[in-house]
UniProtKB/Swiss-Prot annotation:
Presence of the UniProt keyword Lipoprotein in the record: no
Official protein name in the record: Type I restriction enzyme StySJI specificity subunit
Organism: Salmonella typhimurium (strain LT2 / SGSC1412 / ATCC 700720)
CDD domains to which the protein is assigned, alphabetical: RMtype1_S_EcoEI-TRD1-CR1_like, RMtype1_S_EcoJA65PI-TRD1-CR1_like
Domain writeup: Contains two DNA recognition domains, each specifying recognition of one of the two defined components of the target sequence. The recognition domains can be exchanged between different S proteins, generating enzymes that have new sequence specificities.
Biological role: The specificity (S) subunit of a type I restriction enzyme; this subunit dictates DNA sequence specificity. The M and S subunits together form a methyltransferase (MTase) that methylates two adenine residues of the sequence 5'-GAGN(6)GTRC-3'. In the presence of the R subunit the complex can also act as an endonuclease, binding to the same target sequence but cutting the DNA some distance from this site. Whether the DNA is cut or modified depends on the methylation state of the target sequence. When the target site is unmodified, the DNA is cut.
Other information: Type I restriction and modification enzymes are complex, multifunctional systems which require ATP, S-adenosyl methionine and Mg(2+) as cofactors and, in addition to their endonucleolytic and methylase activities, are potent DNA-dependent ATPases.
Complex and partners: The type I restriction/modification system is composed of three polypeptides R, M and S; the restriction enzyme has stoichiometry R(2)M(2)S(1) while the methyltransferase is M(2)S(1).
Family: Belongs to the type-I restriction system S methylase family.
GO biological process entries: DNA restriction-modification system
Gene from which this protein is expressed: hsdS
Keyword list, A-Z: DNA-binding, Restriction system
């Protein structure tokens, strides 16, 4: 870990000098222990282990061994880069085993705080440099033992390690809490947008325009203004299908000027341009009748997202449409396409579509059924006013969502920023000033490293005794 001037009382060392790497255990075969596969190791800083209880005889061979207060982390890609690491806590009888793709770091006689050591392996510096020092084939690269053993570390005194670990737990819990709250907002905004659409198509969004007119309950069990009408989509527009590629033909990434709209692009009321593919000219000529015009509406008719609807934007004028969707075109002069899009996307119509798909045998929305789908129809002038109000409210929601995403980006970088401050000594500067006796003399990091060295020398050559519950 690179760094400038060390804080007072700190010293430099390596992981190999500070702790034991992948030490072995000798336990009674009938001892209950925890077994934790890679999936049980969290990626978040404050995540918990997920393990099951097994007999030691079942897991003592062919797995990595560890005990309470060991720090374990994944050494294989992409688990290493994803930050799979944890301090072992509350395992049955204090012992466990798991994937052979773990590295285990064990403090020597408690002279290194395991939670501080865990913070070290979660830093960006450790993860970045570890990823650059992998060996093996693609998809099976692993952090090398040489990198791990020789990784340089700025070491605080033991008392300060504890303070750093506690501060990190507190600060990063606050980060997680903030992140969790921010991550809830997009779902709240999604519900808000749907509630706006519902209010738009049942007259509540413009109810002040109907002070003199009563609302009526329709056969759709929706209360709407008495001046509004109920009809069918086919009475006000044509419904036509898209077209699959001719047999043996395929799409290409090169922009030929003939875009092909696939079902996966039909989202959020529009056509998403990401991953756009194209037709070669000779193929397009053979299916040229199955194009869309800007302002047409689309609705998906098969697949997991059946019923997704929206408007074809200008940039997709004359594009070909997938056979997995239909277009609604040639609209009557009494219907505004943007209002029809709101109706198609409303929970009222989506519930009708979903109910029929679930009860039907084909799992497909037939063109004839689209024509017969109900349509709530306000006066044309009010349709335009409804759309204006909806778009205004959606713009507010979009602004909030953008601010939330920017805040999430900042929050996501906070963890590494805080960890970097911790290993520069910035989180504990005041503590050091208030506790000089805990960072100097025999309490200094230099003295601590000498103790570790002495303990290691004293324990060298001694066999590990068999442990019992």
């Amino acid at each position: 870990m690179s760094g400038g001037k060390l804080p007072e009382g700190w010293a430099t060392s390596t992981i190999n000098e500070m702790c034991n790497l992948n030490p072995k255990l000798k336990l009674d075969d009938d001892l209950d222990v925890g077994f934790m596969p890679m999936a049980g190791v969290p990626t978040t800083y404050l995540g918990k282990c997920n393990f099951e209880t097994k007999k030691w005889s079942e897991v003592k061979k062919g797995f990595t061994q560890f005990q309470n207060d060991d720090v374990i982390f994944a050494k294989i890609t992409p688990c290493f880069e994803n930050g799979k690491a944890v301090v072992i806590k509350e395992f049955p009888n204090g012992y466990g085993a798991g994937s052979t793709e773990y590295y285990v770091l064990r403090s020597i006689n408690g002279l290194i705080n395991p939670h501080w050591l865990f913070a070290l392996v979660k830093t960006k510096d450790f993860l970045t440099n570890g990823a650059l020092n992998m060996s093996g084939s693609v998809g099976h690269k692993r952090v090398t033992k040489e990198f791990l053993e020789n990784y340089g570390v700025p070491v605080p005194p033991l008392a300060e390690q504890k303070v750093i670990a506690e501060k990190l737990d507190t600060l990063l819990a606050q980060v997680d809490s903030t992140k969790a709250r921010l991550e809830q907002i997009p779902q709240i905004l999604k519900r808000f947008r749907q509630s706006v659409i519902v209010a738009a198509v049942n007259g509540q969004l413009t109810k002040e325009l109907h002070k003199k007119n009563k609302f009526k309950l329709t056969e759709l069990n929706i209360s709407i203004p008495s001046l509004w009408k109920i009809s069918e989509i086919g009475q006000f527009a044509d419904v036509k299908g898209g077209k699959r590629l001719p047999k043996g033909e395929s799409l290409i990434a090169e922009n030929t000027g003939f875009p092909y709209i696939r079902a996966g692009q039909l989202k959020n009321g529009t056509v998403l341009p990401e991953g756009q593919l194209y037709l070669e000219e000779y193929i397009q000529k053979s299916i040229s009748r199955y194009t869309v015009s800007s302002g047409d509406l689309y609705i998906t008719i098969v697949g997991a997202c059946i019923g997704d609807a929206g408007i074809i934007p200008d940039v997709y004028n004359n594009a070909n449409l997938t056979e997995n969707a239909a277009k609604i075109c040639n609209l009557n002069e009494n219907i505004f396409n943007r209002f029809l899009s709101l109706w198609l996307r409303s929970s009222y119509l989506q519930d009708i579509i979903n109910s029929e798909i679930k009860s039907g045998a084909q799992g497909k929305l037939a063109l004839a059924r689209i024509k017969s789908l109900p349509l709530i129809l306000p006066p044309l002038q009010e349709q335009h006013e409804i759309v204006r109000r909806v778009e205004q409210l959606f713009a507010y929601a979009d602004t909030i969502e953008k601010q939330v995403n920017n805040a999430l980006t900042r929050v996501n970088s906070l963890t590494q920023s805080i960890l970097a401050k911790a290993f520069r000594g910035e989180l504990t500067a005041q503590w050091r000033a208030e506790n000089p006796e805990l960072i100097s003399g025999e309490n200094s990091a230099a003295a601590l490293l000498e103790k570790i060295k002495a303990e290691r020398a004293a324990s060298g050559g001694k066999k590990t005794s068999r442990k019992k519950a």
